[in-house]
């Protein structure tokens, strides 16, 4: 009961990012961990002690299963506490979270090995085959008292946390990987996916959560961090297969409908995606956090369609209702309002952005404040607000979801901007638009101009490194320019620092270089 309540508390915190809910989740998780701490002794060692004392093995079985379950819960609590720590995005929080994960890793690894050993012993007992030399010890006695269902449930329980752990570590920004390696645990993406898949098909209570974690990874993480390089639809087949298998079991689930919308958005079926998100919004009538996630996607899909009025309505509601990053929502609201032509109303909201700036170490809020500062002092133009909307679509990897007619309209809107302070940004966005349109030669030219534009360092410091990354990725597509492409990727990673969304770009560069190593072994 305690773990279930603390997990709900954790989910609530992660969906709202409200400070008081995050603190409550930490307290609840620590309480649950303390309840289980007294049972943290090693499972196999405990069994040996019981056997030595001539205690009937069958009587020890419930205790053994209970101890394994408690250890898994402790590790789960550690992972969730680490995640809550990482959300703060401070160096001290990363270090603290890393040490917490170290403890979780040791427990997961031991439980995983113990459960696999018990499953092997159980199978050999059933088939009455002689034990291997590795398993030939007194522990095989207890396998007789463990049911296959209990072992399967335990394997499902540990696989959820074990899989999520591997997946999260495999996506750590490269500049933090050295710290992770020093702590002594690896991150294996394929192992993570395999474990989560096992957990999703198990009878453990976290099976639905494992399914949602897989859908989140395939429809949110993979496209956002460009883990599949220029393939913007990587992971969609896996996500659709999961929905096909599970949809009948959860016909009225707002979350499953939400992920259906994510798949449709990534397939550029924006109208269908909007229908799914609106349906999910209605299904989540009593679930405020899920409603906000749906509203966020409705706002983004509306921006993708250049329907700034509907986008404004969604983001304004989020600004007023959500406690997570009101500063960011205010910026998006102002951008969309200005893009409709209401520049005076937009300026009033741009002035609110600074007042709503609360999370000083949050990159998204820092970006929002810097961008709003200019329009706080002078009335924005509609053209600059449209450019700002295209900018966030680019930074959040949403341009590949746009239709060809809308991309062409965006290209025209960029050309209409006549402001010397945003020349580098304009060229970066034009390069990205032409890349989506399939005009590689034009894209290369615009990216080259953006990469050479020194004037953007003051107002848009991220433009040059992002342009180097984009240019490098394009050059990787041709055998004769692969070496130059790799050089540009390394340049984007090593020659720039202190710009907006630096970690985000490092993850994308890391993924691009990793895919290159797979094609051309070093």
Swiss-Prot record:
UniProt keyword terms in alphabetical order: Repeat, TPR repeat
UniProt repeat feature TPR, residue ranges: 254-287, 292-325, 424-457
Pfam families on file: Iml2-TPR_39
Example GO biological process: otolith morphogenesis
Keyword Amino-acid biosynthesis: no
Family in the record: Belongs to the TTC39 family.
UniProt name for this protein: Tetratricopeptide repeat protein 39C
């Amino acid at each position: 009961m305690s773990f279930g309540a603390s997990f709900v508390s954790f989910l609530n915190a992660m969906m709202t990012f409200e400070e008081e809910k995050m603190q409550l989740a930490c307290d609840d998780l620590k309480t649950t961990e303390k309840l289980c701490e007294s049972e943290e002794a090693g499972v196999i060692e405990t069994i040996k002690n019981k056997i030595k004392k001539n205690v009937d093995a069958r009587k020890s079985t419930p205790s053994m299963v209970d101890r394994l379950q408690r250890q898994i819960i402790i590790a789960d609590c550690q992972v969730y506490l680490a995640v809550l720590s990482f959300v703060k995005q401070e160096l001290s929080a990363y270090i603290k979270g890393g040490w917490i994960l170290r403890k979780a890793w040791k427990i997961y690894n031991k439980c995983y090995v113990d459960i696999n050993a018990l499953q092997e012993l159980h199978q050999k007992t059933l088939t009455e085959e002689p034990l291997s030399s590795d398993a030939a010890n007194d522990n095989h006695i207890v396998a007789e008292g463990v049911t296959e269902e209990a072992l399967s449930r335990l394997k499902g329980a540990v696989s959820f946390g074990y899989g999520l752990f591997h997946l999260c570590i495999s996506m750590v920004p490269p500049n933090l990987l050295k710290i992770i390696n020093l702590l002594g645990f690896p991150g294996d993406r394929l192992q993570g996916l395999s474990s989560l898949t096992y957990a999703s098909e198990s009878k453990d209570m976290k099976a639905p959560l494992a399914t949602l974690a897989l859908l989140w990874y395939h429809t949110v993480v993979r496209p956002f961090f460009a883990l599949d390089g220029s393939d913007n639809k990587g992971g969609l087949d896996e996500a659709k297969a999961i929905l096909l298998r599970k949809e009948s079991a959860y016909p009225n689930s707002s979350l499953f409908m939400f992920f259906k919308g994510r798949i449709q958005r990534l397939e550029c079926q924006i109208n269908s995606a909007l229908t799914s998100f609106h349906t999910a919004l209605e299904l989540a009538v009593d679930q405020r956090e899920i409603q906000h996630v749906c509203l966020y996607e409705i706002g983004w899909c509306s921006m993708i369609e250049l329907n700034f009025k509907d986008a404004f309505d969604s983001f304004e509601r989020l600004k007023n209702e959500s406690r997570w990053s009101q500063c960011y929502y205010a910026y998006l609201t102002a951008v969309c309002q200005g893009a409709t032509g209401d520049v005076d109303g937009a300026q009033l909201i741009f002035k609110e952005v600074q007042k709503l700036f609360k999370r000083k170490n949050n990159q998204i809020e820092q970006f929002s404040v810097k961008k709003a500062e200019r329009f706080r002092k002078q009335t924005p133009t509609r053209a600059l607000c449209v450019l700002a909307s295209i900018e966030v679509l680019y930074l959040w990897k949403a341009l590949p979801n746009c239709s060809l007619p809308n991309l062409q309209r965006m290209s025209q809107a960029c050309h209409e901007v006549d402001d010397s302070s945003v020349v580098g940004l304009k060229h970066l966005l034009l390069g990205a638009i032409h890349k989506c349109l399939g005009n590689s030669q034009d894209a290369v030219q615009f990216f080259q101009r953006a990469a050479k534009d020194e004037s953007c360092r003051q107002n848009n410091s991220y433009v040059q490194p992002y342009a180097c990354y984009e240019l490098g990725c394009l050059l990787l597509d041709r055998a004769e320019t692969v070496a130059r492409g790799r050089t540009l990727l390394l340049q984007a990673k090593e020659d720039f620092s202190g710009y907006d969304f630096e970690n985000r770009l490092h993850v994308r560069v890391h993924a691009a270089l990793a895919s290159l190593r797979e094609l051309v072994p070093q």
